[in-house]
């Protein structure tokens, strides 16, 4: 491969790009219109980057200071051209931007489309929009001249595994910026129709803050089809719902409908405009480890960064922008982190988003339930992290419960339905809702009509340790000792115990405790069990069982707390074991360990010692056969 920077050079695409191009050429998408939106979006980004660079280097603008995007059609030659006068690209920029994909989401994108999922929003989401051009073109030429440079370059590819970069004559290149020429496939020539191009550009990209012109055919005059007025500075009363939707799709990289639109202008000590959206579905990067938000920061309509942490991480699903009138255009990364102006914006924006979610929950419960289904697991991170807004977040929180069926339950509704004598909000945490609902630990609560929240997200076990109460009612795990349960009467139709526990049971409980040794901290008669024989619970003031499991799995638990084995003193199996004489000591010892292992299995664990469990079970079966 030549090292002469003036020579034509052919390079192979990275492996991931080659796979991606193959998918685009043999497109899994029925809606190929997306290509124009993506090219216009890239052109608008290039213009915004130039605006930003020109703050410190105004000479880059020369005598052409106004940004613009031009779309040209050439029906006879089956070509469409999208050109901008933005920042432009150098040779290295072209190789980096058009020959490789640096985003970590690329492989995930390939896997998604490789599975045959027809989901147009993936293109925008994963940052591979340029390559959508190969859905309609069998060759793409890109001619670009970097702002301030005396060189121009041409990038060309047929999308079949390689691309070519060569010098371009200055007279054949834009004075500044980038020109993308699509050589259309035969089945895509209809895109050169002026009406179709104009409607596509207006519907998909009429909101971009850069004017767009259309040249219908070679020699025709350019005419304006979008004036470049930023949508967020226009009065809300003048904006149509479809304009909001189009802008949302562009800024969020989604292709669905927004669940909520938040558009306001703050005035007073500082001025800023906000246009933000709660997506209608989960963005692909919602659970990225860095938990970064995607809100963009503008200063007087000049894009600055999308890395300003304008919202707390538990609101990272919100997409949109903030445009400040007070920050300097040359704001630095350090200033972004330390600016009191931005701190005030963050606070105001966060409170507004949470406030609008609260209004949605109050006025449109069904729509809010969908938002919670998509983003509740992320919002609950705020219960752990944001002490200042914890009460506000608790009011937004929704849960499944033993009384909710397939619906969601708010804490205010839970408190309103609490039983007389009930002092706490009871919950049970675990990995699987069905297993929780079948847990013997819930039997005493069901028998008393006490609602229990069923928490199945990993974050649940953490936030309940940080949120002391709601409306004065503490959160309490049903896997911990529940001293007040016996103070709440059974329901009229609940199964009542026929008799008091036999006196021999106390002796049997003491025997079990002795047999199990330090495997448990105690063995107690249970008030909560009505049908099952045994269950494991945590000590009254010990950690929740699920929290302890999560900490242990993460290697952050030095020593696990010993559980309490609760035994139902009225269960027929327990009564039978308690009635055995001294001659059955060995059998009773086996039974004690089997009861403990039964409780472990019901709690979602394995027997303490699989081999010993098997041997004890075999002896039990043999005894039953012998007596049969």
UniProtKB/Swiss-Prot annotation:
Q: Point out the signal peptide segment.
A: none
Keyword flag Cytoplasm: yes
Q: What is this protein called?
A: Chaperone protein HtpG
Where do the segments described as B lie?
334-549
Gene3D superfamilies attached here?
Answer: 3.30.230.80, 3.40.50.11260, Heat shock protein 90, C-terminal domain, Histidine kinase-like ATPase, C-terminal domain
Q: Which PANTHER family does the annotation name?
A: HEAT SHOCK PROTEIN 90 FAMILY MEMBER (PTHR11528)
Role description: Molecular chaperone. Has ATPase activity.
List the GO terms this entry assigns under cellular component, sorted alphabetically.
cytoplasm
Q: What is its main location?
A: cytoplasm
Q: Which domain of life is it from?
A: Bacteria
